[in-house]
Swiss-Prot record:
This is Holo-[acyl-carrier-protein] synthase. The gene is acpS. It catalyses: apo-[ACP] + CoA = holo-[ACP] + adenosine 3',5'-bisphosphate + H(+). GO terms for biological process: fatty acid biosynthetic process; lysine biosynthetic process via aminoadipic acid. One of its GO terms (cellular component) is cytosol. It comes from Limosilactobacillus reuteri (strain DSM 20016). Keywords: Cytoplasm, Fatty acid biosynthesis, Fatty acid metabolism, Lipid biosynthesis, Lipid metabolism, Magnesium, Metal-binding, Transferase. It is found in: Cytoplasm. Mg(2+) binds at D8, E58. Pfam families: ACPS.
Length: 120
């Protein structure tokens, strides 16, 4: 049974500017494991990865019903690419199944997260 759906669209350039302007931005958004994956990329691909994680976590927070804030932070959610590049939610406060999807254009990243209960 679907418990929540969240979508987000983020401008990649906006995330790039935030990362450039604020030295701790990347560490604020990414968990240590996500930072490991991030470090494997360079140039535009690293910016796309960061924008994708920002957007995925925003989508998760919307599906969860809280938004990012006092009750849910960026480090409460971890999303790692599997061997095929698909995003997998590996850490979250949600006890059911979490399904994530991400897509990029040259300027935008769009994400969706669906939270599903384990009981059907």
């Amino acid at each position: 049974m679907i418990k929540g759906i969240g979508i987000d669209i983020t401008e990649i350039e906006r995330v790039k500017k935030a990362a450039t302007a604020h030295s701790q931005f990347i560490q604020h958004v990414l968990t240590p494991t996500e930072l490991e994956q991030y470090s494997q990329f360079s140039g535009q691909r690293s910016v796309e990865y960061l924008a994708g994680r920002w957007s995925l976590k925003e989508s998760f927070a919307k599906a969860y019903g809280t938004g990012i804030g006092a009750n849910l932070g960026f480090h409460d959610i971890e999303i790692i690419d599997n061997q095929y590049g698909a995003p997998i939610v590996t850490k979250s406060p949600y006890n059911g199944n979490a399904h994530a999807s991400v897509s990029h254009t040259a300027t935008l990243v769009m994400t969706e997260v669906i939270l599903e209960s384990e009981n059907k």
